[in-house]
Amino acid sequence: MTTPFKMERGVKYRDAAKTSIIPVKNIDPNQELLKKPEWMKIKLPANSAKINSIKNGMRRHGLHSVCEEASCPNLHECFNHGTATFMILGAICTRRCPFCDVAHGKPLPPDPDEPKKLAETIQDMKLRYVVITSVDRDDLPDRGAGHFAECVKEIRKLNPGIKIEILVPDFRGRIEQALEKLKDNPPDVFNHNLENVPRLYREIRPGADYNWSLKLLKEFKTIFPHIPTKSGIMVGLGETNEEILQVMQDLRDNGVTMLTLGQYLQPSRHHLPVARYVPPEEFDDFRDKAEKMGFEHAACGPFVRSSYHADLQASGGLVK
């Protein structure tokens, strides 16, 4: 008889320990993988002083970056430019999406001092634009929305004039309560990723719902019509270009004006494999179509991620 898997609180479960308990699809770690094309190969910068400086600054304050926790391919570039996306509410997610490298498990209670520590770190780094994201916290009554609001409040208190983008989870089952918590301390940009097409949601985002995510974006825009909303899509997971275009149209129909679209990369052999590497010219075509749909800002390219050059995109610069 097999002993049921029991998670310990505060322990990070990654790779096979994480994806083996997803009931939707078993991933064969020995399967043959697609070879990376030349356009997907990154040359890492030689100078790591800035990278170490940012990492050390976060360690001193007990903070996390999604750049490290999700193994982002742009980490070296962004850290060398002195930018990072902070991840609040711990580094353990209550979901176990098989595309994501963030650890799964039973998270510890939120750190009540984190908003102040975050604000002080941002002040030390002299940032003028900051992105705040989080793991999913389905264990919390408000799904972590109150903690987001407190972070925004403390950041603005110590950093007047700063621009704040929040990249939020779907606040499953608590949209109204979550948006109520954000009313007094809204961000400058509200970001929530759809990730991929609805046909593949059960496989890619177990525990999430496509229409629920659209509802979150729409309801935020209804309450805060002057604040831009943003969403991100990954390609290369088995979707068709026509399906991606429909997702883009769904976003526009729900008031979203900022888009990021990038290539999915497999974090390990225990994650979903890449079904296709989308060539750069197709990303250019997606950008052209996004602009025709009415997106004010569309960052489309192989290495584009949700917060990649977020400050540049928010100011209207071309990101690809």
Curated annotation (Swiss-Prot):
| EC numbers for this chain | 2.8.1.8
- The entry's [4Fe-4S] cluster 2-binding residues are 93, 97, 100
Main localization (coarse): cytoplasm
Query: How many cofactors are bound and how?
Result: Binds 2 [4Fe-4S] clusters per subunit. One cluster is coordinated with 3 cysteines and an exchangeable S-adenosyl-L-methionine.
Which pathway, metabolic or otherwise, does it act in?
Protein modification; protein lipoylation via endogenous pathway; protein N(6)-(lipoyl)lysine from octanoyl-[acyl-carrier-protein]: step 2/2
Residues covered by the Radical SAM core domain: 79-296
Query: Which UniProt keywords are given for this protein, alphabetically ordered?
Result: 4Fe-4S, Cytoplasm, Iron, Iron-sulfur, Metal-binding, S-adenosyl-L-methionine, Transferase
A single Pfam family it belongs to is Radical_SAM
Q: What class of enzyme is it?
A: transferase
Q: Which cysteines are joined by disulfide bonds?
A: none
The yes or no answer to whether the keyword Iron is present is yes
Q: Which GO terms describe its molecular function?
A: 4 iron, 4 sulfur cluster binding; lipoate synthase activity; metal ion binding
Cofactors that this protein relies on: [4Fe-4S] cluster
The family database entries (NCBIfam families) matched by this protein are listed as: lipA, PRK05481.1, PRK12928.1
* Family the UniProt entry places it in: Belongs to the radical SAM superfamily. Lipoyl synthase family.
- Which PANTHER family does its entry note? LIPOYL SYNTHASE, LIPOYL SYNTHASE, MITOCHONDRIAL
What is this protein identified as?
Answer: Lipoyl synthase
